[in-house]
């Protein structure tokens, strides 16, 4: 997809977000966006299912509520991106840089596709907090939870999740 096509789609999407006549939600399903410069793009609610965003620059992009199911985000720069409520199921985040990204209420892929993702302490503590609220009576889990709990309690979501250090 060339730069002009992307610009046209983003302009129509912006109109859609503002409820303007002629606005159309961005449909970038299966689009080849490898290496695309989408810094600070407003892609709220966009359909990016199966899109190839390998090595794309999405730094500071607004992807709230975007559907990135099955997207290839290998090596993508997502630093400072807002991914609140984004669907990342089946997305490949290997080598993606998510430092300073906001992943609140998003679907983080719990499979090998999220291995090697680069995160900051905020995201790591949030993942740890979600791990620590699981209910499991296995002694190995209990030991891991006990070791992880102090770090998990530093999460900005710890209080919402009812986490307290024991």
Residue locations for each model-derived region?
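Intrinsic low-complexity/IDR segments
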Residues: 1-34, 49, 59, 84, ...
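Acyl-group handoff/entry surfaces in thioester-processing enzymes
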Residues: 45
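Catalytic phosphate/metal-binding cores of nucleic-acid and nucleotide-processing enzymes, i.e., regions
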Residues: 64, 74, 79, 89
